[in-house]
Design a protein with these regions (language model features):
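Class I SAM-binding transferase module
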Residues: 1-115, 122-123, 127, 133, ...
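Conserved SAM-binding loop of SAM-dependent methyltransferases across substrates and taxa
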Residues: 165-181
Length: 448
C-alpha cells in the first residue's frame, strides 16, 4: 500500500552507545551532546570562549588526523530531521488524535447541539472569514445594482437561519460595517440554550441591533412588520384581505452543510424557510453545493467497523465522519474520469414552481401525491431525490473498503469578481478554502 505520509524511521544494526551506561567510562562529549561532532547542533549558549577558539584555530593548522567512527551519528541526524521537518498544517494540528477515529454525523435538526460543539466549530480560521467575504460581496453588489430591499427603512434584510451562538451574525455586522451598506438582521435559532446566548450577545456585543427569534426556521413566518390594522377595527366581507404582517428577507444565510453536503438535511431545511425569501431578488448563502466520492482502501477503518459489526448489525451500513489517515486512493485521474467525482448538486433558492408542486403533493392536489404516511410518504420531498452512477479507473489492484465523501459549496457567485467557495476535496481544498477545519470527510463502508 502506498503510504499517505512518511513512516517512522527504522534503525538497523544500531546498538547502545559505548560507555554511555558505564559510569566509570569517560567519553568525549560536547556539553551534553552524545558526540563531539554534535557541537554544530549546540545552541549559542555553549559557544567556545576566546581562549578555546584560539586553541581550536591552532589545531586546525595542524595536520588533520583521520576521524574515528562516531557511535552516535544516527542521533545527530535524527535531531537534524526533527528540527527541519515541515510545519504541521492547521488541519493536522486540529485533527491530532482524530486520525481514523470513527464518529457519527451530527443531527442538528433532531438534536440541540451542546455549547462545546459550537465552540469547536467556531475555531475554524477560514469558514467564517469566507462567509464574511460572501456577505460583503453580496451587499456591495446589492448596493451597486440598486436593488430594492424588503425593509421599510431601505436596509438590506439578512436572516441567519440556524444562527447557533451567533458567529455568522457577527460576521454579517462586520460585512455591513466594511461595505457601508445598512442591514436589518434577524437571527433565527431553535436551540433554547443557544437562544439565551444570542440574547446576551445582542445586549452586550451587538448593541441590540439584531432581532433574535426562537423558532424552527421552517416554522418562521418572516420578519414581523406590523399588525393587520388598528386595534378594534372590524373586518367585514366587503373589505379586502388584510396584508400579511410579516415581511420578506433579502439575503438568507445558513451553515447547515454536512460532510457530504446534504447529509444534515440542508436542502429540506432551506426549502422549508424559502417562503420568507424575497421572490424576485432574494439570494441564499450558500447558493449551491455538490457532493463528491472516490473509492479508497482503508484497512484500519475496515477492521474497526468489522469489530463493531459483531454487536451492531448496522455498523457496515452507517456512514461515518472521520479524518482519513491510513488510506490509499485507488482511483487515478484520466480524461473524463477524475479521481474524485461529483455525485449531485443542490441549488438555492429553488424555482417557485418546484415548491408549489411540492406543496400541492403535500396536500394531495397532484395525482400520485397525498399518499400520507401509510403509503410511505406524501411525495412533497421528491424534488430532493438524487441518484448517480459513477465510473472510476483504478490503475493498481486493491480492495475497495469504502467510499470517501467530500463536498464543495459556492457561498456567493460574484460574476466577474469571482466565486466565494468552500471545499473539502483533497485536490481542491488548498485552492478554495485552505486550512478549513470545520468538516472531516465522510466514509461510506462497503461489505466485502
Amino acid at each position: 500500500m502506498r503510504l499517505k505520509q512518511a513512516p517512522w524511521l527504522l534503525l538497523c544494526d544500531v546498538g547502545p552507545i559505548p560507555g554511555l551506561d558505564d559510569p566509570n567510562h569517560l567519553t568525549s562529549t560536547a556539553d551534553g551532546f552524545p558526540s563531539p561532532s554534535a557541537v554544530a547542533d549546540a545552541s549559542r549558549s555553549v559557544s567556545p570562549t576566546p581562549a578555546e577558539a584560539a586553541q581550536l584555530s591552532s589545531k586546525e593548522s595542524q595536520k588533520l588526523r583521520p576521524k574515528t567512527k562516531d557511535p552516535a551519528a544516527h542521533l545527530i541526524y535524527i535531531r537534524y530531521l526533527q528540527r527541519n521537518q515541515p510545519i504541521r498544517t492547521a488541519i493536522e494540528k486540529f485533527g491530532s488524535g482524530y486520525q481514523d477515529y470513527l464518529q457519527a454525523p451530527l443531527q442538528p435538526l433532531t438534536d440541540n447541539l451542546e455549547s462545546v460543539t459550537y465552540e469547536v466549530f467556531e475555531k475554524d480560521p477560514v469558514k467564517y472569514d469566507w462567509y464574511e467575504r460572501a456577505i460583503a460581496q453580496a451587499l456591495s453588489d446589492w448596493s451597486e445594482q440598486r436593488k430594492p430591499t424588503s425593509s421599510p427603512s431601505g436596509a438590506v434584510v439578512i436572516a441567519v437561519a440556524g444562527s447557533g451562538r451567533g458567529p455568522l451574525v457577527t460576521r454579517a455586522l462586520r460585512a455591513s460595517e466594511m461595505t457601508g451598506v445598512a442591514v436589518e438582521i434577524w437571527a433565527v435559532e431553535k436551540n433554547p440554550n443557544a437562544y439565551v446566548l444570542l440574547q446576551r450577545h445582542n445586549e452586550e456585543d451587538w448593541g441590540r441591533a439584531v432581532n433574535v427569534v426562537k423558532s424552527d426556521m421552517r416554522a418562521w413566518k418572516g420578519p414581523l412588520r406590523a399588525t393587520t390594522g388598528p386595534i378594534g377595527q372590524a373586518i367585514t366581507t366587503a373589505t379586502s384581505a388584510p396584508a400579511s404582517p410579516y415581511g420578506k428577507v433579502d439575503i438568507l444565510v445558513s451553515e447547515l452543510l454536512g460532510s457530504f453536503a446534504d447529509n444534515e438535511l440542508s436542502p429540506e431545511c432551506l426549502d422549508g424557510v424559502q417562503h420568507v425569501l424575497a421572490p424576485q431578488y432574494g439570494i441564499s448563502i450558500p447558493s449551491s453545493y455538490t457532493a463528491h466520492l472516490t473509492p479508497v482502501l482503508a484497512p484500519r477503518l475496515h477492521s474497526d467497523i468489522s469489530h463493531r459489526a459483531i454487536t451492531d448489525t448496522t455498523a457496515t451500513e452507517t456512514p461515518y465522519v472521520v479524518m482519513l489517515h491510513a488510506i490509499d486512493y485507488l482511483a487515478t485521474s484520466v480524461p473524463g474520469h477524475p479521481q474524485v467525482q461529483e455525485v449531485w448538486e443542490f441549488v438555492h433558492p429553488l424555482p417557485s414552481s418546484t415548491l408549489a408542486i411540492a406543496e400541492a403533493r403535500r396536500g394531495g392536489g397532484v395525482s400520485g401525491g397525498g399518499g400520507g404516511s401509510m403509503s410511505g410518504g406524501d411525495g412533497a420531498n421528491e424534488h430532493n431525490t438524487r441518484s448517480a452512477r459513477l465510473k472510476f479507473v483504478c490503475k493498481d489492484r486493491g480492495v475497495v473498503n469504502g467510499l470517501a465523501g467530500y463536498f464543495e459549496a459556492v457561498l456567493y457567485d460574484g460574476g466577474e469578481a469571482g466565486k466565494v467557495e468552500l471545499s473539502t476535496r483533497p485536490d481542491t481544498i488548498d485552492a478554495k478554502s485552505k486550512d478549513m477545519i470545520s468538516w472531516f470527510p465522510i466514509f461510506f463502508p462497503l461489505k466485502v
